[in-house]
């Protein structure tokens, strides 16, 4: 067995977690396949030998048969023509009893039911009925992931029909699965459970296995499972799409008694068919650095104020991002390599190269869609910020809290006074102000921007401090995500820690330098979770790019979803555009992915952003479109 140091270093080299100078210190640079095999083997071994910080209490295990769907326990809502079951425990050793359950909602036509004396129904699948374009065998199964900020998603405990028929009337089966979130927690009986990565996705995978175990009892095609979510929910939807059947998750699934085989012992897949992600907060192995490259380097207030050591590390992070990005070997739709040129020019740090030009083109395309999709005169104003309002199936008390670890609400934008722009030129003039950065051609109704920095410094300003996701104050939701059973919030960004160690003398020359911050990062880099798995490996497990950026000719570590839809509000300060853009580019390079839609929406922020229409209708239309082609 190789050392933890080799594992961490190999992962850093593979994902760009360390600068090139650090990577060159390795005895050998492993291939992607080598790293996956070695780290997966480590997870398997560690989970059997080290459970030092587990908070879970041993319970008498349930059995697959005892949690199987009971066909005599269906409920029927005659008014809305919905069959449903709530409180279905989907694993035999649940750690979080209020979360590791699911509810299933089925169009009435898909079932034949007989009413029981207690008011429930004994029902079987009706294979002949059709709703829309689907039958009970071909219907897509859609699963919401309403976990903003990587919060927990409590399983439905009561029946709330509002909004369900929006999906069911199209012939979909709607499954609402609970899952653990970023924090440790306590069950109603007083026992404690561990949260954080990778338990949320582990729970959702167990729910998918449960659906397949009950294939003959629950309507819907188990080959057409789609997840959808926003923000941290969008991230976990993307993870569900990227990590299908990954060996990394095996020990975690086993620990909760997931139904990984059918009644005959045949393996059950946890892979899904499609993933919808709005503004996914993901790629956390690189997100702090990409944030400083795209946004932080153009800010000069608060922690990025001139003369502070935190500004110095911000600039260093922006500088080092080029090596990270170039290591990914991303290509455009024509197969051209996308890279950043290293160094300073008039537009900023590493603000040139084919990747830079591609991103600038994406921003311009978004602006031009806005100009063509909207009619002038156009009135804009108000707030563009919307938290998840809860997907159908949840009661108000079950929706995830919109709180950061310190107990303060996530920041919201101050509404602006509505203003009417008479023409596109009026709108462009308002954006340009006294320092023009957009050129507009009225004849073609198209515009171009001078630089990414000009855009971000005006419309996509940094709204987070240094360590946008691994905060120096441990105040971000992601600090909780990579905590463990002993400590709730912990540092995890090895790249930031490396910079603090190797630039200590330079940083300490600043008057505001605090060496305790450096020490706290260093001390927490080697923490392990309740299965003995190091933080660095859990970060890799919770980064979809880990599983996507594998050459087509190498052995794959997972089964990717066939269909992807990625939308983002271009003005959000929550994450850099690199997050969604790199996800799209990586997926486009994979031959085993059937289609990827990527949309950036001008004038929208951290929302379920859409060019036109609404998120629910567009998601449903997309699922119908891609399944019609299968």
Regions found by a protein language model. Give the residues of each.
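C-terminal segment of classical bacterial N-terminal signal peptides
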Residues: 16-24
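Short, surface-exposed "cap/lid" segments of acyl-processing enzymes
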Residues: 109-166, 572-582
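Catalytic-loop region of hydrolases
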Residues: 27-138
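Alpha/beta-hydrolase active-site loop
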Residues: 193-217, 617-621
């Amino acid at each position: 067995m190789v050392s933890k140091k080799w594992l961490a270093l190999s992962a850093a080299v593979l994902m760009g977690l360390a600068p090139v100078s650090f990577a060159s210190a390795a005895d050998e640079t492993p291939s992607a396949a080598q790293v996956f095999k070695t780290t997966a083997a480590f997870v398997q071994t560690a989970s059997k030998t080290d459970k030092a910080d587990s908070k879970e209490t041993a319970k008498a295990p349930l059995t697959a048969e005892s949690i199987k769907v009971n066909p005599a326990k269906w409920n029927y809502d005659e008014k809305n023509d919905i069959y449903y079951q709530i409180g279905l425990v989907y694993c035999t050793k649940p750690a979080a009893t209020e979360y590791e359950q699911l509810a299933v909602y089925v169009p009435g036509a898909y079932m034949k039911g007989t009413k029981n004396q207690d008011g429930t129904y004994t029902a079987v699948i009706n294979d002949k009925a059709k709703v829309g374009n689907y039958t009970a065998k071909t219907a897509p199964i859609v699963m919401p992931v309403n976990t903003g900020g990587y919060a927990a998603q409590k399983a439905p405990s009561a029946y709330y029909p509002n909004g369900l028929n929006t999906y069911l009337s199209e012939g979909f089966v709607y499954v609402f699965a609970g899952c653990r979130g970023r924090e440790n927690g306590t069950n109603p009986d007083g026992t404690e459970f561990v949260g954080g990565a990778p338990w949320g996705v582990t729970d959702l995978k167990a729910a998918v296995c449960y659906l397949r175990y009950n294939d003959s009892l629950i309507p819907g095609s188990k080959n057409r499972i789609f997840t959808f979510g926003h923000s941290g929910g969008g991230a976990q939807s993307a993870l569900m799409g990227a990590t299908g059947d990954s060996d990394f998750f095996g020990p975690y699934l086993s620990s909760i008694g997931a139904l990984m085989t059918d009644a005959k012992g045949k393996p059950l897949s946890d892979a899904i068919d499609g993933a919808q992600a709005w503004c996914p907060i993901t790629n956390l192995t690189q997100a702090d650095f990409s944030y400083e490259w795209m946004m932080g380097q153009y800010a000069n207030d608060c922690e990025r104020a001139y003369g502070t050591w935190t500004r110095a590390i911000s600039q260093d992070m922006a500088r080092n991002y080029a090596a990270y990005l170039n290591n990914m070997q991303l290509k455009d739709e024509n197969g051209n390599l996308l890279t950043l040129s290293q160094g300073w020019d008039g537009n900023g740090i590493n603000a040139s190269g084919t990747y830079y030009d591609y991103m600038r083109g994406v921003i311009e395309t978004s602006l031009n869609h806005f100009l063509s999709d909207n009619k002038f005169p156009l009135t804009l104003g108000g707030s563009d910020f919307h938290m998840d309002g809860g997907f159908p199936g949840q009661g108000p008390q079950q929706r995830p809290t919109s709180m950061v670890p310190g107990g303060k609400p996530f920041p919201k934008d101050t509404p602006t006074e509505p203003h009417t722009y008479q023409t596109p030129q009026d709108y462009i003039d308002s954006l340009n102000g006294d320092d023009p950065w957009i050129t507009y051609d009225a004849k073609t109704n198209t515009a171009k921007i001078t630089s990414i920095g000009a855009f971000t410094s005006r419309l996509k300003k940094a709204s987070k401090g240094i360590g946008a996701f691994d905060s120096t104050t441990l105040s971000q939701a992601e600090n909780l995500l990579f905590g463990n059973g002993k400590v709730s919030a912990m540092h995890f960004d090895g790249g930031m820690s490396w910079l603090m160690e190797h630039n200590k003398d330079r940083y300490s020359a600043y008057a505001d330098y605090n060496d305790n911050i450096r020490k706290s990062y260093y001390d927490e880099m080697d923490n392990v979770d309740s299965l003995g798995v190091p933080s660095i490996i859990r970060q890799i497990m919770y980064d979809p790019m880990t599983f996507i950026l594998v050459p087509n000719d190498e052995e794959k570590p997972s089964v990717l979803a066939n269909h992807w839809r990625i939308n983002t509000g271009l003005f959000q300060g929550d994450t850099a555009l690199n997050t969604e853009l790199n996800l799209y580019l990586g997926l486009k390079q994979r031959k085993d992915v059937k289609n990827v839609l990527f949309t950036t929406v001008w004038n929208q922020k951290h929302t379920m952003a859409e060019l036109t229409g609404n998120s629910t209708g567009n998601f449903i239309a997309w699922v119908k479109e891609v399944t019609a082609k299968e």
